[in-house]
Amino acid sequence: MNLDRNWVPMKWPCGPLEVARRNKSEQMHADVKEMLEAWGRPTGLELVKGTPINCLIVDWASGGPEDSAQQQALKPLLEAGRRLGISFVGKVALKEGVGAAVAAARAAGLSAVMLENTSGQSFDLPVILQFPRDKVAWENASTIFSSRENTWPGLGLETMKGDTAIAGPTGLPWVNSNAWFSLLSGELAPGKTVWLDFDPPDASTLLHPASYSLAFADCRAYASQWIISLDDKLRAALLRANSQAKGIWEKICETVAFFQSHREWEAFEAQGVLAVVSDFRAENAFLSGEVLNLLNRRQVQFRIIDRSRSLPASTPGLKAILWLDKEAPSPPEYSYLLAFARRGGLVIAQAYWGPPEAMPSEKNLSLHYKMYNVAKGQIAVAEKGFEDPYQVAVDTHLLVSHRNDLARLYNSEMTNCYCSGDFESPRHGNRLVQVLNYSSEPAEFVTLWVNARVGSAQLWQPGTKDARTLQGVVASPGTDFRLPSLSVYCALEFEG
């Protein structure tokens, strides 16, 4: 029995354990209790029957007196789910007795368990390890692993007044996204799949529901997986067959089905003229993570390189390297960076470690960077080091320059795009630009510019079976594409 990367996971709260938790947190209302009881019955599975959602996460053991009752109550649900082809993952939150809980899960027919750590034990059932986002043990991550303490995608509540977005420090509305962490996971745990665990905000209602489709798209566009989680009001309304709730659920399933039909995109490689290099661990984790997050907010296209592994021999299209760590590069890293600069590249660092004969010059006094000319390229060194992640992101964006953008979005400050490419398969040369709208309102009159001359592109959107051809308009030195009204997401695929 192995972990299945084709699983589409969803939280399935039910049973005595969830009831006890809600009672302790004073979140138990009559409609919530009714919902928890209904979701614990086999008939509750009608919600996911016939949908792409094929893996349910259930509480299995927490070390309390309700564990035995929980496991007994789940038996009919597990049996009915197996007949529908649904897999179950049991969440085990124990410090002691983990082995017995896992053995009980195996006997009950669960497909896997989710644990915070294995304490060096081996089990006869696949394990999904779950970590706090800032404490992921990358080298020990399971084939599928999970992180918690993630953010709900969309406009930050601190930048909202009613339905109006207020500018953040960037001068733009403050957009929350897990994109940077998904990309980081792909680099630090290659060949593995991360499940992001986060719940909808408490403010979500049927009249103003959280954007579930955006939450899912924000993960899948960057090759991670969201553990789908519904708010209590929506769960209760679905039990009553409320038409509004059914519409929200259908949109969720529509988005899931769309991404399931484009699994090949997950193998596409991130594109960008900037490489962000760090070991992304220990004392370097906070700065590097914040810089990635802020670069993404500024719509900078970048690649991530883990310096704990060998630096890549080939970096086609790369124009700049941001060396984030305080430590000077090792001799092989030094040779790599120096060769890159000598070929005309830009290296950005917080301390100078280049050739001693190079003399600094001020390229731009407002940036507070010293510029060292090295053959055809330069090393840019921050005068005060990298003290503020926000300033590092701003300065990097200015040093790399907009003229090196691979793609730009016009007429909407609450959208973002991700550029990737297929360089391995027979479709070698295909480029993909995925566009996400983080506003609760449709984005209108948005133009996507790409840095290549492209006659046309295939436009993909959830809810449509086939792509439609979108004609490009020459916008030297690239091409403009005028996008249709964008509710949540679209993707443009083209050769170039």
Language model segments and positions:
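Extracellular/luminal ectodomains and secreted, surface-exposed scaffolds of diverse proteins
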Residues: 466-476
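C-terminal beta-strand-rich structural cap/linker in extracellular carbohydrate-active enzymes
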Residues: 348, 475-496
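Carbohydrate-binding surface patches
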Residues: 272-297, 336, 416-453
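Glycan-processing catalytic domains of CAZymes
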Residues: 1-323, 331-345, 349-360, 365-388, ...
